[in-house]
Amino acid sequence: MKKLLAILLSLLMVAGLFAGCGSSEKAPETTAAPAAAETEAAQASYMDELIAAAQAEGTLVVYGSCEEEYLAVACEKFQELYGIEVQYQRLSTGEVQSKIEEENGNPSGDVWFGGTTDPYNVCAAAGLLEAYEAQNASHLLGDAYRDADGYWYGIYKGILGFMVNIDELDRLGLEVPQDWADLTDPKYEGLIWLSNYNTAGTAKLVINTMIQKYGHDEGIQYLVDLDKNVQVYTKSGSGPSKNVGTGECVIGIGFLHDGITQIVDNGYGNIQLVIPSSGTSYEIGATAIFKGCKHPNAAKLWIEFALSPDCVNLAQDNGSYQFLVIDNATQPEVATEFGLDPENVMDYDFEDAKNNITTYVEEVMTALGGGDDRFKTE
């Protein structure tokens, strides 16, 4: 009898152990939901407080380096959502950089919207941008689409390439260039347009791309050779694309989404897009807060807005067909229909570009003898 009681007692103890183990495994499930709920509640509370503070400031001033149509509707949407008056001005990235450098910590604008990150990095290094840890940055597709210290956040990705007027090339008896090296062929003399290295972030990306592709000295020499065929250097990066369809520009170097705009929205079926056969690079279009801005809470709210579908989904309905870089956005199908692939790009060294672009621009302009009248912006 005693032996039987001992066996029963042992079985009860083992059962108790299993029951204990089972309850310990389920414990995180009972606490995970409240923890997530608390986080969401804290984020919602933060946004409510930020919106109230931004509305108390009443105004936001935006400098936009994206296309003006997209800039306008984004600013209108922000004003509609939050009841904050938005003033905006469209400037190239180089113009924005020059403006806030001159204002030196007392900016007339609050935020920068659009344009490639190279000028943003120069301004961040000069202490002209304000770091901000955005709540909506959690939706970015990867760390490559933000500054590590929060000085800027990516909103889109654009592919660099050529746009050509096939009617004009056919009339001239010339084939479509397929790669970067083709553009230095003397037969294309006077047919190429490129943006200005001094004023356009697109042109700065071209410099970085050639140096990373060919090496420092060879990259600068490539740009010297290319210069012999360049007819016009435009102030803005989208300038070449806007003149290809009319035939004024026969070969334009720039972002291919700008070419799509000309084909789809403006009806220029004579434009062909060319992705360089040996590879190409890309921009990350960004947004940032100016250090010392007059409306800091409205500026922070803009960053949250810019990292949301409310903002970025407006792009493709307003002539901007870049790939989007947040996980809850709707990608522009038309970009892939034209053969663009956001992953089919070279391994672009953003750190080298960040640290050296100012020096590279100076070196290129020196190699070009300081630049002729084509580089005048007035």
Outline where the language-model segments fall.
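Mature extracytoplasmic/periplasmic domains
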Residues: 280-348
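A ligand-binding cleft/hinge motif common to bilobed small-molecule-binding domains
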Residues: 118-122, 251-270
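Conserved C-terminal helix/tail region of periplasmic/extracytoplasmic solute-binding proteins
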Residues: 340-378
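Short, low-complexity disordered leader/linker segments with a strong preference
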Residues: 1-57, 373-378
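Periplasmic-binding protein-like
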Residues: 158, 222-227, 233-234, 267-291
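A short alpha-helix/helix-coil micro-patch that ends at or immediately precedes a cysteine
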Residues: 74-82
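Extracytoplasmic ligand-binding site segments that recognize negatively charged/polar headgroups
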Residues: 61-75, 87-103, 107-248
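A generic structural signal for short hydrophobic patches within well-formed alpha-helices
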Residues: 120, 169, 259, 311-312
